[in-house]
């Protein structure tokens, strides 16, 4: 309350007050207020990475992943070796790609006889995800690892490199079970 009062009555002190408010709102995880203060600070200092990071975190807290990704990419436009932005984008694309691959595998397994869509179409879909999202994740993780290598990044890069377009094999139990469920 005191900071808001000072900000209102002493306009020349706004930037300093906003810095303190931003820190407070980040600590409280108050995404809407973080976003408001960060935008106000960015209007004066658009290239400030700390403000952009706070804005990206707030957007993520609000569930706006796409906008958070764009802000993180803006950070990389300013500093292409920013560890946090590269790590965030690597994680984002890795998760997005793995979710798509899992969805394709599930769809393939649910296709009772493999007749609705041929296996080659599923493989092509998986190849596309690996070439797009997974390759993007590997690129960002590789840059982050060059800046500050750690075990997590090495494991993620290894795991992502091991992904393939191979289709899952269903056991003899799953297909009959799925058929029975569909009939009931």
Spell out what each predicted region is:
Residues 20-24, 55, 89, 96, ...:
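Structural register within alpha-helical repeat arrays
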Residues 1, 95-140:
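Short coil/linker segments at helix-helix boundaries
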């Amino acid at each position: 309350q005191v900071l808001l009062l000072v900000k209102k009555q002493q306009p020349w002190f706004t930037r300093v007050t906003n810095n303190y408010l931003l820190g407070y709102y980040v600590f409280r995880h108050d995404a809407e207020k973080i976003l408001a203060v960060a935008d106000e600070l960015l209007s004066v200092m658009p290239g400030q990475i700390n403000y952009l990071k706070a804005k990206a975190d707030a957007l993520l807290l609000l569930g706006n992943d796409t906008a958070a990704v764009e802000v993180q990419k803006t950070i990389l436009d300013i500093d292409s070796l920013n560890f946090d932005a590269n790590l965030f984008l690597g994680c984002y694309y890795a998760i997005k790609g793995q979710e798509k691959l899992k969805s394709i595998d599930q769809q393939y397994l649910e296709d009772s006889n493999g007749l609705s869509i041929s296996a080659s179409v599923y493989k092509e879909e998986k190849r596309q995800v690996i070439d797009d999202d997974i390759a993007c994740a590997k690129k960002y993780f590789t840059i982050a690892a060059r800046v500050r290598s750690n075990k997590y990044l090495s494991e993620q890069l290894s795991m992502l490199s091991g992904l393939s377009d191979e289709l899952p094999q269903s056991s003899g139990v799953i297909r009959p079970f799925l058929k029975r469920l569909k009939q009931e």
